[in-house]
Amino acid sequence: MSYAELFCQSNFSFLTGASHAEELVLQAAFYRYHAIAITDECSVAGVVKAHATIEQHKLDIKQIVGSMFWLNEECQIVLLCPCRKAYAEMCRIITNARRRSEKGSYQLSEWDLMSIRHCLVLWLPTHQASDHYWGRWLNQHHNNRLWVAIQRHLGGDDDAYTNHCEKLAHELQQPITACGGVLMHTAERLPLQHILTAIKHGCSVDQLGFERLSNAERALRPLNKLVRIYKPEWLEESKYIADLCEFKLSDLKYEYPTELIPNGYTPNSYLRMLVEQGKERRFPEGVPEDINQTIENELRLIEDLKYHYYFLTIHDIVMFAKQQGILYQGRGSAANSVVCYCLEITAVDPRQISVLFERFISKERKEPPDIDVDFEHERREEVIQYIYKKYGRERAALAATVISYRFKSAVREVGKALGIEETQLDFFIKNVNRRDRSQGWQAQIIELGLQPESLKGQQFIQLVNEIIGFPRHLSQHVGGFVISSGPLYELVPVENAAMEDRTIIQWDKDDLESLELLKVDVLALGMLNAIRKCFQLIEKHHQRSLSIAEITRRQDDPHVYRMLQKADTVGVFQIESRAQMSMLPRLKPACYYDLVIQIAIVRPGPIQGDMVHPFLKRRNGEEPVSYPSEAVKSVLERTMGVPIFQEQVIKLAMVAAGFSGGEADQLRRAMASWKKNGDLAKFKPKLLNGMQERGYDLAFAERIFEQICGFGEYGFPESHSASFAVLAYCSAWLKYYYPAEFYTALLNSQPMGFYSPSQLVQDARRHGVEVLPICVNHSYYQHHLIQRPNGRLGVQLGFRLVKGFNEEGATRLVERRPKTGYHSIQEVKQILRSRRDIELLASANAFQILSGNRYNARWAAMDSLSDLPLFHHIEEPSVGYQVQPSEYESLIEDYASTGLSLNRHPITLLEEAGILPRFTRMKQLVDKEHKSLVTVAGVVTGRQSPGTAAGVTFFTLEDDTGNINVVVWSATARAQKQAYLTSKILMVKGILEREGEVIHVIAGKLIDCTHYLSNLQSKSRDFH
């Protein structure tokens, strides 16, 4: 007996299906089903994952593509796709139903179903009186492709329901098929299905009533059980229907947009013409012969693989940005392409890095090329709307991102469904260390009071584990566009995104890659925004027009590199983290390629592969550089015999083990997923044998494989690092030569980067930049530059810092400000007409120029008469609040209202008040010996817990002389959890460690001093 499951919902039927699509197809294959249809509700979001699993595991089971729908909450149908036309038809129906409704819901119309010409229709009667109407209606429109589908779940009314369905089928003269209405791959998922249903209905499992499944019969069931439940002919009918469904997802073929080709050109000739023009601009002194040859090789491969439309599409998008003055930069593997460089998609000169085109495009790699282009954060929307306008909503949409349950949401939702008090759930979430949330959280929650021996405690742990990774909803990808030649909804359904004027498809980037479908990544980068604003300020105040290309043309300024070697990189792109700052004085970058290495070396790949210390020792002359062969030397010479980049690992496999370019790229893909899939192991014999056959000893081969495994943690491509190094150098150059403009641009681009506005302001002042407070007569919404009496430019802080004060109010205040400025708070009140806005400005001390202090300003703001139009003519009382706020009170108010203070540092005030015990300042640490005991104190401005740091957290403490690096080991953190997690002002007793110019403190004792300034509103930036 054979059977095909024709109605099966995965967890992409959100809060209904209790299994992943991958689990469903694996279990169905284990049961030896003939076929399985993944039929999520008005969705195909799970079908590609099922397809990829069948392909990966070479399963002997057929996949059917379909979807389930409700019409008017009375008629339930499943559509199945027998052919490509049927699939396009179903996608159109899903798109129409989704687009006419809000995100997360759909509205199917009778016309949608009446328009069906190719899909097979399974009708699932609801055992209601309306079944007779809907049966006749469906029969009228789909007589030759309609089945009555019977589900038997062994409930109390099964026999009555079956008789009802059989009568309907007889009346309509339509065949019957068996189907399971499957929601889970095994019966063990029933408790999770109950949890999902409870979440859906906003109640606990105990309150579900009849919404709760009475048994586990909606799991996939073995054939020997099905034959006892269904008539043989019904099971055979399911196989017959499955055999009608010949459509496969692999039949989908992507068609690129074609309208970019001018008359008289073919796609290939037009691309070649653009490349020829571009190479003349890129190489004005003449194109080197090897570059010409590389271009020819790339163009030939692009033509063979028919990717020319893709390159032309990207070129069109970046040319639009260029014409509009929007800064952009291509990055990632595209930097391995000289064609991309000539088309001005990327900014990295191929002569500066080791180009590996196989990393970008390979005949043996079954995936399209991937070009990531970053645009200014604030202007990317212009690019997105250009794409929509050029290609139309019917041909362009963003890829989806699957938002899944993670620790926090899983604990909260599962706990509520089990009836656990919300206060206890909040306590768990708050006190479980962030770095342990992926693993090890169970033990921590038990320590926090969960009773593991209780039934509820056991259920909680099991169900949280099961639901983590389950999809919650579809969101929009950060910028991955799918653009097609014809209607996109014939390829994949399109639905509304949460953001206005955005639409998304129902597949994510992994789905697109599995089906070899193209996406164009239109991404946002805050640093490009900051650089553009900095250029504008420089042009305004110095009449100098700059560009990234001009700054990075030479990339050899010794002043800039000396600044980097001192780790003076707050605000500098990619090298501003504490880990990067610790590495800079050790690596001492002195040229552009050093920066490329610097960015890549502080990554999990090189660290896990134990490549950092050997590289530094060789660079410093402490260890000899040697190569086992000239072939290996050609790959590793630029990094002193140590593989730092992904491309080097790929090249090593090619030159030392005989891998082809495509095989080496498959190795790269396996590296990226080896922890998840264990795919690297299959390459080990070929790698070891290939290297030994070429004369390399086994120890060397084993070491290379271990390094490859290290890269599997997260190897950084040279091309990616090279693209980032361009912006790193540019931002460093701007910081050195134009600090006032640089910090103003950064502050106007927040939020971005590692540092808060408070930290940026403190760093600006340490660099001699005068920063002026928010002022009702001098500030604008944005921060701006003003000429100071000493001839230098100072930063005038803007209203954007005032918490709760919006841009609309600030704009009105500035536009109506007299040339001589406001003379009283009453004038301002007449313009803003909002007591709340006046109070916000008063709290930020923006009225100091009018009132002397914020207390007087707040007193004036409390005058209720002037809020009434009848009393606007009454003059403000002249009696003010005569008590001056203390420096301490001003500090508290500053942080509460703006997040920063230009007054003296909190640590200075605490020390002067005699509150803090004796401690060592940051500037004094340079005089301390290695391994000496020290006590430091400061405001906690950052906590970083990198995934590769083996349980280490890096704290940044800011005192009144600078930033202190503190290393907190996991044992110390666990023993002093409260101080570790919640301190805003922290004193640390520990051991000073020094390596060259790098100084940090290994924490021993953590002392929370927050209560000394209990109202301080300074927030640290925590990165995990």
UniProtKB/Swiss-Prot annotation:
Among its keywords, does the record have Amino-acid biosynthesis? no
The entry sums up its family as follows: Belongs to the DNA polymerase type-C family. DnaE2 subfamily.
Question: What is the name attached to this protein's record?
Answer: Error-prone DNA polymerase
Which Gene Ontology cellular component terms are annotated? cytoplasm
Gene this chain is encoded by:
dnaE2
Organism listed in the record: Vibrio parahaemolyticus serotype O3:K6 (strain RIMD 2210633)
The record ties this protein, via CDD domains, to: DnaE_OBF (cd04485), PHP_PolIIIA_DnaE2 (cd07434)
* Protein's UniProt keywords contain Cytoplasm: yes
Role noted for this protein = DNA polymerase involved in damage-induced mutagenesis and translesion synthesis (TLS). It is not the major replicative DNA polymerase.
> Pfam families annotated for this entry?
DNA_pol3_alpha (PF07733), DNA_pol3_finger (PF17657), HHH_6 (PF14579), PHP (PF02811), tRNA_anti-codon (PF01336)
Its lineage reads: Bacteria, Pseudomonadati, Pseudomonadota, Gammaproteobacteria, Vibrionales
State the superkingdom: Bacteria
Q: Which coarse location class describes where this protein primarily resides? A: cytoplasm
Gene Ontology molecular functions: 3'-5' exonuclease activity; DNA-directed DNA polymerase activity; nucleic acid binding
- Keywords linked to the UniProt accession: Cytoplasm, DNA damage, DNA repair, DNA replication, DNA-directed DNA polymerase, Nucleotidyltransferase, Transferase
Which InterPro entries does the annotation name? DNA_pol3_alpha_NTPase_dom, DNA_pol3_finger, DnaE2, DnaE2/DnaE/PolC, DNAPol_HHH, NA-bd_OB-fold, NA-bd_OB_tRNA, PHP_dom
Q: Which reaction does it catalyse?
A: DNA(n) + a 2'-deoxyribonucleoside 5'-triphosphate = DNA(n+1) + diphosphate
Q: What is its EC number?
A: 2.7.7.7
GO-annotated biological processes: DNA repair; DNA replication
Location in the cell reads: Cytoplasm
Which leading EC class covers this enzyme?
transferase
